[in-house]
Amino acid sequence: YESLTLLAAYAGITTRIRLGSGVYLLALRQPTVVAKITSTLDTLCGGRLIFGVGVGGENPKEFEACGVPHQERGARVSEGIDVVRTLWRETPASFQGRFTRFENVSIDPKPVQKPSPPIWIGGRSDAALARAGRQGDGWISYVVQPERYAQSLEKIRRAAEAAGRGLDGFVTAHLTFVTVGRDYETAKRSWVRTLSSRYAQDFGP
């Protein structure tokens, strides 16, 4: 399903649970429109939105279908985060970037959460970890062993320090996959087959 559409449906049938995307491929969308959609969603759910974003890239055909050069995806996500935050927080807002430019525009309604909803960065690559440290309010990990998890947190800390940011209030989350089978090996084979197909990677031992 399209994640933000699904979260809008959940907003109407829940009252307390936080609603988040894990993760939204921001490079495939126009960030000014995304700012409006997510601001509306945060209003509908009463300030419960967590906006999880990522680069993706496992399936280049997604980018081809959207007319987005695959090699630009990281740069588009980094800039898109700044675009979304600018429109969430400023009225009027102006932005001059590589992919997006506007002068004296605004969106309404603004998000309920102030100064803006949290943005969590998903990914395992060094580029994703650096982005989380520079721009994120949190990090979403997935399919990572404890040693690599600890190393990743240190990379995030160093990136934040280089950007002159503190990590007070920074949140770490983990995307967990659960597979049920008659025994461990059966469940594991099903998990590896499903995840390898979904992410176009080999998740085998």
Predicted regions and their residues:
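Active-site-adjacent structural elements that line small-molecule/cofactor binding pockets in enzymes
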Residues: 1-205
